[in-house]
């Protein structure tokens, strides 16, 4: 009798212990976010570069047709409408994340976005020392992070929650960042082998920023990879060649440029795995921007795009509707009638329709690793296809 009772108690304790482990694991994966903190470049810039610009020399993103599909008037976003970060905010039931520069009242409640058009993962001084001297934004990832650290104490004093708790309740979007570290030398004519030498340094810069934010209390990171650059009108124009073997016969993209993007992504995933093992109390999610976009080039019609996905919607000239020096927003440059039928917006950036398609498959876990449990995020929809506002 006593033996049976002991076994029963032992079994109960084992079940209780197992349940505790499952609950703890579930809590570590499933978090109700109260804000989004964003770092990066134009892929996530919601107006920073616009507010940093000279009022007499405003960027193209300050004028139509930028923003024509949603924001009316333009908001400084480099697209015809919403970005991936906007769709993530919608899904989480959070406000669109305002740009830090130009904001009157910066707060955790609204979220904060430090992403700036043209930003690099590596500091400007370092890139110039490597002979990369393009006229890029001097707001690298480390500069963005330092600004955040400087304002963090003020953000916390206005709330009953402490800094670590507030940052722990935030989804931290780390980019995309790093593509400009490669864009500039590519457009200066440097070889792929030369540019490959930058990849470990770019990965280290991203990793260091994540570690700094973990030390500050960050618990959930969404870290995007690089894009299939060989499918972009700007690159297709720059590296245009009549040789058929230089292009993928199925998509028309340039394989060697896409392989470079994949090389960056493999290095990034390896580093994120290392960080996850080192900091097992946080969630580090890799967002596969490469494949979530590349599938649209593979089967454009299936996803509602024209059967000519390599051309820019807004641009002029050539096979890809793109001419360097006559980009979208310049006089005499026209825009397509229906941006939702195009993958690419202006040669360098994507349309709102593309951003939506990418956000859907990242949020549903198809192109996120590991897939995140959004069931307690506050969103009403956790199905395969998410319903965003229009």
Swiss-Prot record:
Could you tell me which InterPro entries the record lists for this protein? Answer: GDSL (IPR001087), SGNH_hydro_sf (IPR036514), SGNH_plant_lipase-like (IPR035669)
What CDD domains does this protein's entry cite?
SGNH_plant_lipase_like (cd01837)
Asked whether the keyword Plastid is assigned, the reply is: no
The top EC class is: hydrolase
Q: Where in the cell is it found?
A: Secreted
Catalytic activity, EC: 3.1.1.-
Q: Which Gene Ontology terms describe the biological processes this protein takes part in?
A: lipid catabolic process
Tell me one GO molecular function of this protein: hydrolase activity, acting on ester bonds
Q: Which residues are glycosylated?
A: 105, 138, 321, 364
May I ask which residue range the UniProt record assigns to the signal sequence? 1-26
The terms describing its cellular component in GO are: extracellular region
Q: Which UniProt keywords apply?
A: Glycoprotein, Hydrolase, Lipid degradation, Lipid metabolism, Secreted, Signal
- Active site, renumbered: 42 (nucleophile), 346, 349
Keyword Lipid metabolism, does the record have it?
A: yes
Its family remark reads:
Belongs to the 'GDSL' lipolytic enzyme family.
Q: What is this protein called?
A: GDSL esterase/lipase At1g28640
Instruction: Name the species this protein comes from.
Output: Arabidopsis thaliana
């Amino acid at each position: 009798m006593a033996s049976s009772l002991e076994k029963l108690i032992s079994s109960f304790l084992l079940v209780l212990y197992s349940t505790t482990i499952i609950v703890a694991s579930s809590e570590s994966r499933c978090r109700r976010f109260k804000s989004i903190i964003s770092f990066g470049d134009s892929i996530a810039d919601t107006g920073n570069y616009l507010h940093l610009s000279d009022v007499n020399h405003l960027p193209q993103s300050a004028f139509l047709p930028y923003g024509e599909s949603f924001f009316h008037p333009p908001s400084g976003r480099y697209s015809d409408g919403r970005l991936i970060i906007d769709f993530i905010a919608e899904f989480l039931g959070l406000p669109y994340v305002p740009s830090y520069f130009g904001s009157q009242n910066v707060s955790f409640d609204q979220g904060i976005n430090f992403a700036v058009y043209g930003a690099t993962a590596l500091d400007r001084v370092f890139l110039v020392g490597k002979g990369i001297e393009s006229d890029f934004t001097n707001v690298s990832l480390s500069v963005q992070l330092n600004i955040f650290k400087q304002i963090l104490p003020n953000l916390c004093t206005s709330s009953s929650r402490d800094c670590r708790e507030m940052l722990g309740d935030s989804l931290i979007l780390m980019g995309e960042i790093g593509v400009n570290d490669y864009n500039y030398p590519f457009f200066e004519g440097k070889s792929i082998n030369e540019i490959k030498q930058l990849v470990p340094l770019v990965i280290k810069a991203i990793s260091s920023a994540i570690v700094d934010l973990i030390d500050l209390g960050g618990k959930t990171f969404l870290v995007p990879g690089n894009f299939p650059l060989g499918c972009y009108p700007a690159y297709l124009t720059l590296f245009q060649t009549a040789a058929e073997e230089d292009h993928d016969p199925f998509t028309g993209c340039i394989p060697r440029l896409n392989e470079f993007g994949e090389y960056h992504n493999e290095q990034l995933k390896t580093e994120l795995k290392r960080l996850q093992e080192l900091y097992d109390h946080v969630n580090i999610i890799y967002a596969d921007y490469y494949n979530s976009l590349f599938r649209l080039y593979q089967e454009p019609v299936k996803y509602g795009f024209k059967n000519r996905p390599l051309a820019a919607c807004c641009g002029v000239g050539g096979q890809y509707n793109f001419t360097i020096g006559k980009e979208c927003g310049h006089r005499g440059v026209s825009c397509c009638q229906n941006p939702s039928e195009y993958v690419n917006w202006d040669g360098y950036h994507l349309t709102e329709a593309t951003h939506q398609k990418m956000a859907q498959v990242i949020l549903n876990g198809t192109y996120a690793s590991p897939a995140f449990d959004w069931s307690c995020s506050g969103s009403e929809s956790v199905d395969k296809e998410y319903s965003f506002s229009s």
